[in-house]
Amino acid sequence: IITGDFNLEYTDPLHARMVAPFADGTPPLADAWDVAHPGVPYPPTFRIYEKEQPGDPELHCDFIFLSEGLCPRLRAVVVDGQTQVSDHQPVIVTLA
């Protein structure tokens, strides 16, 4: 599992690099949101309650990447949009 604030959006080429195959044949990582919610847009995780400038757009820049072996164990991925203790919203995965 690799998780955190990556300071990039889903459309950034670096996100594509995170889920690209490894040169040595190791299976690629998977974005947990994409696994749990295929085709569903990412909810915002940044600038919901704290904006540097009025009108700053909300962004999704917090990701959880899973190894191939963990993907079948993924049960849920949610963004807690109510918490106001940081400028980022928690992204929570449930594995079983």
Describe the residue ranges of each PLM region.
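Active-site donor-binding loop signature of nucleotide-sugar glycosyltransferases
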Residues: D34-V35, V79, L95
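Active site of divalent-metal-dependent phosphoester/diester hydrolases
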Residues: L8-P72, T83
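Short glycine/threonine-rich catalytic loop with a Thr-x-Gly-x-Asp
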Residues: S86
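Hydrophobic "anchor" residues on beta-strands that sit immediately upstream
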Residues: I1
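Short, well-ordered beta-strand micro-motif
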Residues: I64-L66, I92-A96
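Active-site metal-binding loops of divalent metal-dependent hydrolases
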Residues: G4-F6, Q89
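Low-complexity, intrinsically disordered Gly/Pro/Thr-rich segments
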Residues: P72-Q82, P90
